[in-house]
């Protein structure tokens, strides 16, 4: 039974690691110990502070996840302070096979997080199109022009949130709908288990009987030929019956490596929408929203400071709020810029080291195949001026330097020149797909 406990809690941690920030995972979840007895999973925290924090922030999700993974709706999960007992009387199931059937899975295992909705999704320029399409899919699941619906973008930008929001909205309108959200790795694991237990027909029947199938991180299907084969036939079965398919990946579907061309072709049948890294205003709005959800009083000037310093993704913004909140609760200090600077000094230092104006100039010059000196020159030719404007806009977005400081790094230009460059690039991103693609590619390079 110890092996069963270890496997269940390990599976829970693997799933939680994809849903929370690295900071939250390493600080609050990974150190927890687990034991199992009398149909109860007990988690052990190192002190009362950790116990209360996990209870408030993560226990509901842990309960849902543990019941889903154990296929036991009655499983009881508690958390207490202490260490895991060295010897336990553990009760085990007498069955070795876990059949994946429509009745046992769909009854309570949609995989959805009910807290991830459209209402608490913070919209900005970087994600407004993705949210609009997601809402359209939720309104009319299965419509041909949005089926399949593919979301793509970097880690922690809100793809998973939108998938859950679509599923929750569909179930809200039609509680009888068969809706399942699943990570691609879980799809693979379920298939392997079904093959091992000789229940592959139940596996096929379940997935092909759904009304809405949402698979996250489909890039993990790469090089898994058997899983791709099964997904291909599942896709065809659902599509032919006008059932909604929603997928998320870290790259534009046709650019995912080691995925069969016939699958890529089908992903192009519907609509693919990117989610970009959030701009400053959206980052600030996200920070304020996350603070409000946690009943944390976050001064606006602190939110702007954090928004300027942390520029990569939503997950890290949320992790920063959790870390600052925990520190201030523990020390009984108010959240100030000085407190944030002290608490997140390692994280902020890593960003400051990663994204500098010089680094931006280097990456932009390489991308456009020009010299760094060209960006600082007086040349006004289009082949030089446009990359220079792009570099200025990126410097404004990805660093905390002022406009005059940015101008000085580009050949001593005036701050009004930098303002004009930022305005030009922002306008072109709305009208010129090639500029938008360049901006996205450069942002990813600078944030990776």
UniProtKB/Swiss-Prot annotation:
- How the protein assembles, per its UniProt entry? Oligomerizes as a right-handed, spiral filament on DNA at oriC.
Q: Quick one: a GO cellular component term?
A: plasma membrane
In the UniProt record, the signal sequence range is none
Q: Which UniProt keywords apply?
A: ATP-binding, Cytoplasm, DNA replication, DNA-binding, Lipid-binding, Nucleotide-binding
Which Pfam family, an example, fits this chain? Hda_lid
Q: Where in the cell is it found?
A: Cytoplasm
Under SUPFAM superfamilies, the record lists: P-loop containing nucleoside triphosphate hydrolases, TrpR-like
Q: What is known of its domains?
A: Domain I is involved in oligomerization and binding regulators, domain II is flexibile and of varying length in different bacteria, domain III forms the AAA+ region, while domain IV binds dsDNA.
Q: Quick check: keyword Protein biosynthesis in the entry? A: no
Superkingdom, natural source: Bacteria
**Organism classification, top ranks?**
Bacteria, Pseudomonadati, Pseudomonadota, Gammaproteobacteria, Pasteurellales
Q: Which organism is it from?
A: Haemophilus ducreyi (strain 35000HP / ATCC 700724)
- The name on file for this protein is Chromosomal replication initiator protein DnaA
What protein family is recorded? Belongs to the DnaA family.
Database matches in HAMAP family: DnaA_bact
């Amino acid at each position: 039974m110890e092996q069963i406990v270890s496997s269940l809690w390990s599976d829970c941690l693997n799933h939680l690691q994809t849903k929370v920030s690295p900071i939250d995972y390493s600080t609050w979840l990974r150190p927890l110990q687990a034991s199992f007895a009398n149909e109860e999973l007990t988690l052990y925290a190192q002190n009362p502070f950790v116990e209360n924090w996990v209870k408030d922030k993560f226990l509901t999700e842990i309960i849902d996840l543990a019941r889903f993974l154990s296929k036991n709706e009655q499983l009881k999960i508690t958390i207490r302070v202490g260490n895991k007992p060295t010897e336990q009387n553990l009760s085990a199931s007498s069955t070795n096979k876990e059949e994946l059937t429509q009745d046992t899975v769909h009854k309570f295992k949609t995989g959805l997080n009910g807290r991830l909705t459209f209402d608490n999704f913070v919209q900005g320029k970087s994600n407004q199109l993705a949210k609009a399409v997601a809402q359209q899919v939720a309104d009319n699941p299965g419509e041909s022009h949005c089926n399949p619906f593919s979301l793509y973008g970097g880690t922690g930008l809100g793809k998973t949130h939108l998938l859950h929001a679509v599923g929750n909205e569909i179930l809200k309108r039609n509680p009888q709908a068969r809706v399942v959200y699943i990570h691609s790795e879980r799809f693979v694991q379920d298939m392997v288990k079904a093959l091992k237990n000789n229940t592959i027909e139940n596996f096929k029947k379940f997935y092909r009987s759904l009304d809405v199938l949402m698979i996250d991180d489909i890039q993990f299907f790469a090089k898994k030929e058997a899983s791709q084969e099964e997904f291909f036939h599942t896709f065809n079965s659902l599509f032919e019956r006008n059932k909604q398919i929603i997928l998320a990946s870290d790259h534009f579907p046709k650019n995912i490596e080691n995925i069969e061309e016939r699958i890529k072709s089908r992903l192009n049948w519907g609509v693919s929408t990117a989610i970009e890294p959030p701009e400053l205003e959206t980052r600030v709005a996200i920070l304020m929203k996350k603070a409000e959800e946690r009943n944390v009083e976050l001064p606006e000037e602190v939110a702007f400071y954090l928004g300027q310093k942390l520029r990569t993704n939503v997950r890290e913004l949320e992790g920063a709020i959790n870390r600052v909140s925990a520190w201030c609760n523990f020390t009984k200090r108010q959240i100030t810029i000085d407190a944030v600077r002290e608490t997140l000094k390692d994280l902020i230092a890593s960003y400051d080291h990663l994204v500098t104006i010089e680094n931006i100039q280097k990456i932009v010059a390489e991308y456009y195949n020009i010299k760094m000196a060209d960006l600082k020159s007086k040349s006004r030719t289009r082949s030089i001026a446009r990359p220079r404007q792009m570099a200025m806009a990126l410097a404004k977005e990805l660093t905390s330097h002022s406009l005059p400081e940015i101008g000085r790094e580009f050949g001593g230009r005036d701050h009004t020149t930098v303002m004009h460059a930022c305005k030009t690039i922002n306008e072109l991103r709305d009208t010129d797909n090639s500029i938008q693609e360049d901006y996205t590619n450069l942002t990813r390079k600078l944030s990776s």
